[in-house]
A protein has these predicted regions:
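Conserved catalytic-core motifs of GNAT/GCN5-like acyltransferases
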Residues: 108-110, 125-140
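Conserved beta-strand in the GNAT
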Residues: 48, 55-64, 70-77
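Conserved active-site tyrosine of GNAT-family acetyltransferases
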Residues: 21, 119, 124
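Active-site rim helix/loop that mediates acceptor-substrate recognition in acyltransferases
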Residues: 21-53
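Conserved GNAT acetyl-CoA-binding A-motif
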Residues: 92, 99-112
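A conserved beta-turn-beta hairpin within the catalytic core of GNAT-like acetyltransferases
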Residues: 65-74, 83, 133-138
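Conserved acetyl-CoA-binding loop-helix of GNAT-fold acetyltransferases
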Residues: 78, 84-97
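A short beta-loop-alpha structural element at the N-terminal edge
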Residues: 2-17
Length: 145
C-alpha cells in the first residue's frame, strides 16, 4: 500500500527525498545537487510517497510558493521500479489538494518535454513557448486549482 506524507525540511526523510531526486532527475543527466539548493527549499512544501509495508520513500515532489495565488510544482520523481503505477499522478493530486487547502488557486510548472503528456493527463495545459534552462528543454504548464 502507498501512502502520501508531508516531509519536514532538514529531516532524515528530507535527506532521503534529496537522494531520490538526485538519483532519478539529476544523475542520469550528469547534473549535481548543490547544497545551495537546500537554502531555497526551506520554505517549500515537500511531499513524499512511501511504501507503507516497509516505510520506504518511493516518490516525492516539492511545492514552491510564487505569490499568494500561485504555487510551483517541482521535481516530481518516482523510484524507477514503481513508475507507471499511478504514483506520480497520485502525488500530483495530493499536492493539488494541499495547495488548495492553504489558499492557492493556480499551480504552474516547468515540464521536460518527455513529461508534457503526463501533465496534460493531470489537467495541466501548456502556456507560452518551449524554453531551455540549464541545457534542458521545458514547457511551461499551468493548472487552475
Amino acid at each position: 500500500m502507498k501512502k502520501m506524507i508531508d516531509i519536514d525540511f532538514g529531516s532524515t526523510r528530507y535527506d532521503e527525498l534529496v537522494e531520490l531526486r538526485y538519483k532519478i532527475l539529476l544523475e542520469p543527466l550528469g547534473l549535481k545537487f548543490l547544497d545551495a539548493h537546500r537554502a531555497k527549499e526551506m520554505n517549500y512544501l515537500h511531499i513524499g510517497c512511501i511504501e507503507a509495508l516497509d516505510d520506504k520513500l518511493i516518490g516525492g515532489l516539492m511545492l514552491a510558493p510564487i505569490d499568494n495565488e500561485t504555487v510551483r510544482l517541482m521535481e516530481v520523481c518516482v523510484e524507477t521500479k514503481y513508475q507507471r503505477e499511478g504514483i506520480g499522478r497520485a502525488m500530483v493530486q495530493y499536492a493539488e489538494k494541499c495547495a488548495k487547502e492553504v489558499g492557492y488557486s493556480k499551480m504552474v510548472m516547468h515540464a521536460r518535454l518527455t513529461a508534457v503528456h503526463f501533465y496534460e493527463k493531470c489537467g495541466f495545459h501548456q502556456e507560452g513557448d518551449i524554453f531551455e534552462e540549464q541545457g534542458l528543454t521545458f514547457a511551461r504548464m499551468i493548472k487552475d486549482l
